[in-house]
C-alpha cells in the first residue's frame, strides 16, 4: 500500500493555482491535470468516478453492509492560492523534528521560527513537511486530498471494514471563492459531508 507521504508529494508536484481573473471554470486548466490524475488513481482502485466539465470530480464507494445507512462524503479542493507560486514545489522533510527553528531557505535567510509559531514545539519528534521558501507548499488542500485518497485505498484493500456508501468529491477554485458555485449537491448524493 502506498504511504500517505508519497501521495502528498505526488499531489503537490502538480501546479494547480487558480486564477481570480479567469471567467472559466475551472479557472485554470492545470487544475484538471490533478483531477485527471486522481480520477485515474480511483479507477485503478476499481472506484467509479468522473470529472465533469466544470472540474468537479465525484466518486462513490459502494456500501458493503446490508443495513441502509445515510451516505457520507469527504471533500477537498485541488487548487492552490494564486498569491504564491505553485510551480516546481520543493518539499523539505524534517524527520524527528528537534523542536527548534526550521531553515527554509539559506539564501533568503528564511526560517520557520518557534518564536513566531510557538505551536511548533508540540510537534517535537514528528515529521514536518515544509516548502523550500521559493513557493507555497500546497498543503491546503493537497494534504486533504492525500488523506482522502489514502482512506479510499485502505478501504479498498480492507473489505472486512464495514461501511455504508461513501462519496468522494474534489473541487476546483476554492481559493478564489468559487469552489462550490457549480457543485451539484444532489448528484454528489451524501447526506453528510466533511471537508
Model-assigned labels for residue ranges:
Residues 121-195:
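Acidic/histidine-rich catalytic neighborhood of metal-dependent amide-processing enzymes
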Residues 2-127:
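Acidic/His- and Gly-rich active-site-bordering loop/insert found
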Amino acid at each position: 500500500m502506498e504511504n500517505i507521504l508519497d501521495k502528498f508529494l505526488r499531489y503537490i508536484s502538480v501546479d494547480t493555482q487558480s486564477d481570480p481573473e479567469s471567467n472559466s471554470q475551472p479557472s485554470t486548466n492545470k487544475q484538471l491535470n490533478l483531477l485527471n490524475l486522481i480520477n485515474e488513481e480511483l479507477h485503478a482502485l476499481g472506484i467509479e468516478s468522473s470529472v465533469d466539465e466544470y472540474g468537479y470530480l465525484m466518486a462513490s464507494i459502494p456500501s458493503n453492509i446490508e443495513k441502509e445507512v445515510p451516505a457520507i462524503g469527504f471533500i477537498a479542493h485541488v487548487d492552490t492560492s494564486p498569491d504564491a507560486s505553485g510551480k516546481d514545489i520543493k518539499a523539505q522533510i524534517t524527520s524527528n523534528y528537534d523542536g527548534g527553528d526550521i531553515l527554509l531557505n539559506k539564501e533568503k535567510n528564511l526560517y520557520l521560527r518557534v518564536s513566531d509559531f510557538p505551536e511548533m514545539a508540540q510537534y517535537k519528534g514528528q515529521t514536518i513537511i515544509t516548502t523550500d521558501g521559493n513557493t507555497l507548499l500546497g498543503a491546503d488542500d493537497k494534504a486533504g486530498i492525500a488523506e482522502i485518497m489514502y482512506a479510499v485505498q485502505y478501504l479498498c484493500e480492507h473489505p472486512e471494514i464495514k461501511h455504508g456508501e461513501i462519496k468522494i468529491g474534489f473541487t476546483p477554485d476554492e481559493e478564489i471563492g468559487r469552489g462550490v458555485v457549480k457543485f451539484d449537491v444532489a448528484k454528489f448524493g451524501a447526506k453528510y459531508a466533511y471537508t
